[in-house]
Amino acid sequence: MARKHTFPSLKRAEILECIDGLGIPFTAKELDQPTSKAVIPLYEEFLDLFMGLTRQNLEEKVNSLQDSVENFEIIHESLRFTVFYQILSQFMQNICFHDFTIQDLLKPDRNRLQLILSAVINFAKLREERLQQFDDDIQKRESLLETYTLLDAQRKDLEEKVLLSQDRKLESEAIIKQNEERNEEMFQSLIEDKRLCSQVRTEYDRIRMEASELKIRYHNVDSLMASTLEEIEKLQSSIVHSPEKLKGKIADTSLRIQNDRSQQVELDKKSKILHTKLNSLQLIEGDLNACLKVLEECLVELDKLEHATVLLSTNQELCDQIEINKKKLEFRKEQLLKQLSNAQEKLEHEQHSRNQKLEAAKQRMDNIREEYKVITQERNKKIQETEKKNAMIEMTEQKIAGMREELESQISSITMEFEKLKSHVELYIAELLRNLRSSNS
């Protein structure tokens, strides 16, 4: 027994026109002589158009079964066909075509294909008519998705900045630690150099004092030698003729000369020592200048250290601010996700309510069709009776006239009843649409 469907069957020309309007390539020959190779791509286009399931999405669903299925490469095509059939069957159930079978894919029949395409086209028309009722929800959903995408991109950007700041912070801390260690070493070296400088200055002052004393003594010796030479010249003028006295004076003079010579040798030695110490002092003075230059470099490094410390503090504040912004963005993201979830739940609830009301309306239409069928059968019976009475018109003309009037009155009452039922149905559908609009708003 053929299953009854709630949608009207469309004509061949109308089906081809609607499919062409959807932008799907499908010829009249493929509709009249359908094959599996022709209908499977057509159904794939329907899934892509109405469910957003592309061939790539289908491959991803099949590939997700790779870990749970043995010999995946061998049965890949069979798995793909099975998954495709399951999704397509679910789609057919949703558009009220409940007797879709695998034969419709493998060995499609012309009449069933025409019926299936009628179901899809009627669903597309109904979807297009009802789509305006959900425009606000769709726009809100798209707006929320765009906001979520933007916030997610900002969150990733901030995370990258935080990671970069943390890396810079670690590098700055390592550089600061190295600078602190180097500054500590240089500070200790400066303290030692300062101590050595003070010792060298003390030694230098002592040597200068000794040099000045030696210069004074040297001048004294020179003056003494000059006076001695003068005395010798005086003595030469007054030569002593007594040998004993002469020998005594000679001995005294020799002794004085030897003493002067020894003093001169000592003075020469001290002068050489002083020259050596002066050279050492000059070298020490060069070392002191180098130490002063190192000290200036240390001061520059200390300034750099202070600048790096200020920069580190600024980066730390920036990192803290970024963390605060990150937490705010995460909180905002959770709020948006909750709003999106609530909107989706509301949309699903509205769709479920709409489906229930549509099912009720379809059931009512089925009942009306059954009643109309019964009325039509009764009308056919009356017509048959009328034909029999027309055959006997010569015998019972008056009786036939009366029955004809009675039949016409019954037909008019039936027509009026049908019109009433039709007006009730239209009123019910209008009330249903108004309730749907009020529930959506």
Curated annotation (Swiss-Prot):
One of its GO terms (biological process) is initial meiotic spindle pole body separation. The keyword Transmembrane does not apply. It comes from the Eukaryota. InterPro entries: Kinetochore_Nuf2_N, Nuf2_DHR10-like, Nuf2_N_sf. GO terms for cellular component: chromosome, centromeric region; condensed chromosome, centromeric region; cytoplasm; kinetochore; meiotic spindle pole body; Ndc80 complex; nucleus. The keyword Zinc does not apply. It is found in: Nucleus; Chromosome, Centromere, Kinetochore; Cytoplasm, Cytoskeleton, Microtubule organizing center, Spindle pole body. One of its GO terms (molecular function) is kinetochore adaptor activity. Acts as a component of the NMS (Ndc80-MIND-Spc7) super complex which has a role in kinetochore function during late meiotic prophase and throughout the mitotic cell cycle. Acts as a component of the essential kinetochore-associated NDC80 complex, which is required for chromosome segregation and spindle checkpoint activity. This is Kinetochore protein nuf2. It comes from Schizosaccharomyces pombe (strain 972 / ATCC 24843).
